[in-house]
């Protein structure tokens, strides 16, 4: 179980780190070597940490994950029992929620940028 977790983390880290660590001049070999070292260090650190977890806690976590899988399966079954019209409505509703969250993030970022700009203008005015 722990090996699967470690392997999953390693894959995620290696793909994201590799994408972020490649340089613009194309020195992918150096980036890959650095990435491999970083990934291996993280895996070793996690293995050391996972070794300190009590067996009772591991069992508890495993039961939790099994329960989550059952819940997600039940959710899929419930969704599949809905009429096509209801499924389409939920899909459209999700699109609108995404638009709202993107819109909200844009507004928040604009407000932060405007606040930063106004603070910059104040400091320029006092000079």
Swiss-Prot record:
Question: Residue span of the signal peptide, if any?
Answer: 1-16
Q: Which cellular compartments is it found in?
A: Cell membrane
Using the UniProt record, give the first listed, main subcellular location: membrane
Residues carrying lipid (N-palmitoyl cysteine)? 17
S-diacylglycerol cysteine lipidation sites on this chain? 17
Bias-annotated ranges (Polar residues): 107-118
Region feature Disordered, mapped onto this chain: 107-127
Report the membrane topology from the UniProt record. Answer: Lipid-anchor
Which keywords accompany this UniProt record? Cell membrane, Coiled coil, Lipoprotein, Membrane, Palmitate, Signal
Cellular component (GO) terms are: plasma membrane
> Per the database entry, which stretches of residues form a coiled coil?
56-101
Name recorded for this polypeptide: Uncharacterized lipoprotein RC0077
